[in-house]
Amino acid sequence: MLWNLRCWKLTILVCGLSAAQSLISFGPMNLSAEEPTGELAQRLSKLEVTQYAPAPGYSEGPTWRQGEVFFCSGALLRVGRDRKVTKYLDLSPAGTFLRENGDILVCDNKNRALLNVGSDGVVSVIAEKYGDKPLNSLNDLTVDAKGNVYWTDPSGSSAQKPVGSIFRVTPTGQVDRVAGNLAFPNGLDVDPSGKNLYVIESQTQRILRYELPANAEPLGTPIPFFHLGGAGGDGCAFDAEGNLWVADFHRQETSKGRITVVNPAGKAVAYLNIPSKVVSNVTFGGPEHNEIYCTTGEPPGVFQAKVGVKGFRGHPARELRMLRKLGIRPEM
């Protein structure tokens, strides 16, 4: 999956916007080109963003835990409190999610499985099949208020061939395909209210909003929420006020990536420019949970900014059924 993802991103940078953008009806999304002017916009425009740690290659899926940052770059890597980068697990991960108990959920494409990396070092499989078929490609993930885990599968999809999917596993282990016909579904997150799932559909440069069902049903028809433009978005994270912070992958007008902050009404309220050509994902962290950590591609690594905005800590992934232990341990 990571290879496919990198190929898509290289295509975006070389060829520009997808021609399919003109075929998409964006409905009620805010398409205003006006620059945000509020207090947050002014503050972020002056904020210093620094490289927190380098990486050996293209980086994805950051998670902050007790002073350490975990991210994906050929393996699951860890940035210690001394900012030294080491390999934590020999996986092929694309996304991570911190559980309230300190465990980390991982979308792993080496084992084609959703994994739980325990704070005690035990690695367990949560999901590896859909029906009688192995999982295909796991990209990014999130958790809803009921403890269901959602992940995107963009494999083989494009604007011309929208075959991407969203999957869900319940706390009891039931795996379902809950949405399809997507043009490269990428980052996703559940808002603080627990009522809505937001998904970045990268190859249409838009963010979609799904109302979460009351029961174990598939997702309904999505509502177009925001049009990013540029090369489309990648990963995202909510702050405590319900604003969505989006890794706005690459902006042709600046030849850099940025974080775009979108309020609950679907309006861009601030931008944070990142000193890298591409920005892949973002998470909140720090002792006060008011810093952001974003992963990048050129140069590869983790960048940090003290934004002074409290991040939403995510809904708790309660007791999850573990299928089996994987038999590997972190490289401590």
Question: Over which residues does each language-model region extend?
Answer:
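Glycine/small-residue-rich hydrophobic helix-like segments
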Residues: 212-280
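A short helix->beta-strand "capping" segment at the edge of beta-propeller domains
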Residues: 35-56, 222
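Beta-rich, blade/repeat-based domains predominating
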Residues: 52-67, 72-74, 90-108, 113, ...
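A detector of repeated loop/turn-to-beta-strand junctions in beta-rich toroidal repeat architectures
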Residues: 111, 161-163, 204, 219, ...
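Short loop/turn segments immediately following beta-strands, especially the blade-tip
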Residues: 210-217, 306-313
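A short beta-strand motif characteristic of beta-propeller blades
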Residues: 48-53, 83-89, 124-131, 174-180, ...
